[in-house]
């Protein structure tokens, strides 16, 4: 299911969100089957969303293959790229302005930051962590760069990503429908990349943002 809340007062609104990076696989059919059934039984909607933010693996023909595979299985959708709907567009590559507005809010509130570390540095960091049997993850080297310096470097064209700024202390708590209350120390949560160097969002941002909306 998606992150959309369902209850007796709100019909379920669920989705399947495959990535057009190759041939359709059984996982897509599995999710579509269960979510479509859930939507139909609850009088809700079943959506098809195309998660096409991984441009390095994107295959133009894969989207049509996804459509045909789901139609062949009889798993028709109510809203999607080919049908439209009240929350269009349903391709993530066509929603970049929406993600950018969210990032601007996160940056302004201090919940995200630009990271100028090169791919080589990140690779070396991970190798060092493996060699020293340390927890893998970003070391926060760019967390304390001033806003002025960060903006200047970005204006100068220096390559960067935008990361989530996870608090150094405390814990994150949420309720899982199956497992109940889950508590995770913030020290164990990585500063995940939200926007890549090409300006496209990662799964961590786009998937959550679209499920909520």
Where are these predicted regions, by residue range?
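N-terminal Rossmann-like or analogous alpha/beta NTP/dinucleotide-binding catalytic cores
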Residues: 2-131
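A short, compositionally biased domain-edge/stem linker segment
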Residues: 1-6, 147-151
